[in-house]
A protein has these predicted regions:
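Signature of extracytoplasmic/envelope-associated structural regions
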Residues: 1-257
Length: 257
């Protein structure tokens, strides 16, 4: 019998082709986490029926429930503009829409607090967020696009007109949709003992972001699932996550209300 020693769990998450259709995990579906549990309960109840002897009893089946709780993880960027982090599938399932303009351009002219003409507006859409460079101290502010007409764009007002030329960047955006259409298959592998399990039809019911000036940004996801399975899938040969592990308080976070 193999005894587990050390952190030998691997977790993977992948968007399903349809609700409850178990996805096929690959090495690049890997996620880094501090704590993640897959949940499953039979919900059987003791029968109220009287029996001839007190030492015999039966239980009644109920609806089986399943779910997942990613209760602790550091939110690490991919390190590449336009490339989602390894939590991309979970964030898309939580918000409903993911767009990737993947645009790093400059402000060409007509710079105002509410808009400008860009060198290029390729890939932008109304509702996308953008990071602008403002002032001599190269302060950065985030805003949301209100209109896009080629390279001419307007946005929610910022504190001052952006620099000309100044950087205009829009990477990965998540937007609320009226319908959350994506479900997930979430896999757990114990590499030492060969144990594996998964939940399919997982829905992100709750997501939390935590920001502290003295700590790394953390994120939580949780929600119900259709069911739990232990067969029908295999562990990929590698565990490859996007980007690099957190190595200090670096980078910026922008939130547009």
């Amino acid at each position: 019998m193999t005894i587990e020693s050390g952190a030998l769990e691997q977790k993977k998450a992948k968007i399903e082709s349809g609700y409850g259709t178990l996805a096929t995990p690959s090495s690049t579906d890997a996620i880094r986490h501090l704590e993640l549990q897959l949940q499953y309960k039979m919900n059987r109840e003791r029968s109220p029926q009287k029996r001839g002897t007190p030492d015999h009893a039966s239980s009644l089946p109920r609806r089986i429930t399943a779910g997942f709780d990613l209760s602790s993880a550091m939110w690490e960027p991919s390190g590449t503009l336009g490339t989602a982090s390894y939590f991309g599938p979970l964030l898309k399932a939580a918000f409903g829409t993911q767009t990737t303009p993947n645009l790093a351009t400059t402000i060409a002219s007509s710079s105002l607090t509410t808009g400008a003409t860009l060198t290029s507006g390729t890939g932008l859409a109304v509702g996308d967020t953008a990071v602008l460079t403002i002032g001599t101290g190269a302060r950065r502010e985030i805003t949301r696009l209100k209109s896009v007409a080629g390279a001419a764009v307007t946005w929610d007002a910022v504190s001052a007109a952006p620099n000309t030329p100044g950087a205009f960047v829009s990477g990965v955006n998540y937007k609320f949709a009226s319908t959350l259409a994506d479900s997930l298959s979430i896999f757990l592998f114990h590499t030492g003992g060969g144990y594996k399990e998964a939940v399919q039809g997982a829905i992100v019911d709750k997501v939390e972001f935590m920001f502290d000036g003295t700590k790394e940004a953390t994120i939580k996801f949780s929600g119900p699932a259709k069911t739990r399975v232990r067969t029908g899938f295999s562990q990929p040969g590698a565990h490859t996550t996007v980007g690099s592990p957190a190595s200090g308080l670096v980078g910026n976070f922008y939130l547009d209300g």
